């Protein structure tokens, strides 16, 4: 019976998707910096004509400060725009579409309005996108390594996250986190990172939600009934399963956290040899 209900839901989604295309709905990337003035508990109105956006956390709650020592805050003169994950004392993993000319990286941060004693700030020494040191493709290979200009010191609130030892199993319980919006379609940016527990979803669900999308090197994650998702502003942050980074927040459909419309994540394990080779100096 459960299988029948899932298949019926997928059929409904396919029909809804086809109708949205007939009605002129558009799938594309939606990307912008998040201005510092929008931080806090105020709600910011935005005009969104796109159905795909960079991702944020919805349906979750504030992360415990001690539970995200690997989470990196990426910002520039325009404000916060992405998150990243500390892999070791000099390398951060994020999404390729988070590439900017003037990136700064803050480690050991929780509340964006509070300065912490062990907080550290770095800038990139180099940025590397998969298969190219110059051209960062945004969606087909949405992964980027940033080498820091100087090593960071581990502390109570700064510590690397492990790379995956194996790919995640379908149905795995995972956690995604970030400083992205906690409401949609209106956006509300929190002062602190939020965490939400979601699952790695089976390929038929992903195929039904995004029938024209290549499923190579990506994961779909969320909950079938909706209500929990990454959303606008969470891009580049980690999807963590069993204490390892298995995904990088990439994109999804807007509004976020809808029925049978999961978030899309770069599958880190598919790039594990490239990541290890770069870090090893190859």
From Swiss-Prot:
* Signal peptide stretch: 1-18
Q: What is a single cellular component term in the Gene Ontology annotation? A: secretory granule
User: One Pfam match, by short name?
Assistant: Trypsin
Biological process (GO), any one: proteolysis
**Where do the record's glycosylation annotations fall on this chain?**
41, 45, 135, 149, 153
> What are the catalytic residues?
97 (charge relay system), 142 (charge relay system), 235 (charge relay system)
Subunit info here reads: Monomer.
- By what name is this protein known? Snake venom serine protease NaSP
């Amino acid at each position: 019976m459960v299988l029948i209900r899932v298949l019926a839901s997928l059929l409904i989604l396919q029909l809804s998707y086809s109708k949205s295309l007939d009605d002129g709905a558009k799938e594309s990337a939606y990307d912008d910096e998040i201005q510092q003035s929008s931080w806090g508990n105020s709600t910011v109105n935005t005009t969104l004509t796109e159905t795909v956006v960079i991702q944020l956390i919805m349906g979750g709650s504030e992360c415990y400060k001690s539970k995200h020592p690997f989470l990196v805050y990426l910002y520039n003169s325009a404000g916060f725009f992405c998150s990243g994950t500390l892999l070791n004392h000099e390398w951060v993993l994020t999404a390729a579409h988070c590439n900017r000319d003037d990136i700064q990286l803050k480690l050991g941060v929780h509340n964006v309005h509070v300065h912490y004693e062990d907080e550290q700030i770095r800038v990139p020494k180099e940025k590397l996108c998969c298969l190219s040191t110059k051209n960062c493709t945004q969606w087909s290979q949405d992964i980027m390594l940033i080498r820091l200009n100087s090593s960071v010191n581990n502390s109570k609130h700064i510590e690397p996250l492990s790379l995956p030892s194996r790919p995640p199993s379908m149905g795995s319980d995972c956690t995604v986190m970030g400083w992205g919006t906690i409401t949609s379609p209106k956006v509300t940016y929190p002062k602190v990172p939020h965490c939400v527990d979601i699952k790695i979803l089976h390929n038929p669900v992903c195929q039904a939600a995004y029938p024209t999308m290549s499923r190579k090197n990506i994961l779909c994650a969320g909950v079938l009934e909706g209500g929990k998702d990454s959303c606008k502003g969470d891009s580049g942050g980690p999807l963590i399963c069993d204490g390892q980074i298995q995904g990088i927040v990439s994109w999804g459909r807007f509004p976020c956290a809808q029925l049978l419309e999961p978030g899309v994540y770069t599958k880190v394990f598919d790039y594990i040899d490239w990541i290890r080779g770069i870090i090893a100096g190859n």
